[in-house]
Amino acid sequence: MEDMMWLTDKSRIQQTNEANNWYLLDNEVFEDEDGTIYLTPRGFKTDNYTIPDWVAWIGGSKSKWDVRPSHLHDFACEYHKLIKVKMTKSSLKRYKYLTENKEGMKVCEDIPTNCLELVDVTKWEADCLFKRAMKSTKVIPSRVYNTFRCGVFFNFGWLKKPKIFDFSKIYTKEQ
């Protein structure tokens, strides 16, 4: 087992014209404990932490903590799938997909779609991944990530029919 970690730095998001909706400005990449790498693409629309207000109150606000885990979870909830990167961390660095921008932030350039795979995910898997992704930030206290993990148990949005993901629009806001 490897350490799980975010391979990209904190989120940069842009507010949409809709209340509580944001677009990711950068690709976000997470390496899970088994070495699997997941991508949440730039242009993805999110509402950050979608948890009941009472859970947020217990956990100390929805926007106080690193929001990258919520984006990964939102993607899984919207499509019932995740984007798996079919490259290793060292390959991503070697081919300059994982790099630093001029401000010194770790970023991920657009990975070609032939190096990506859409994989099915169950609600349980998505919720457990959410907790691991929160834990890996190393800034979200355990009481918060455990509370938020319990909160997503009540996410009945999963029961909606999932959207179909279109790889031809992966890095756009048209998804």
Question: What do these predicted regions represent?
Answer:
Residues 1-175:
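Extended terminal accessory/targeting regions
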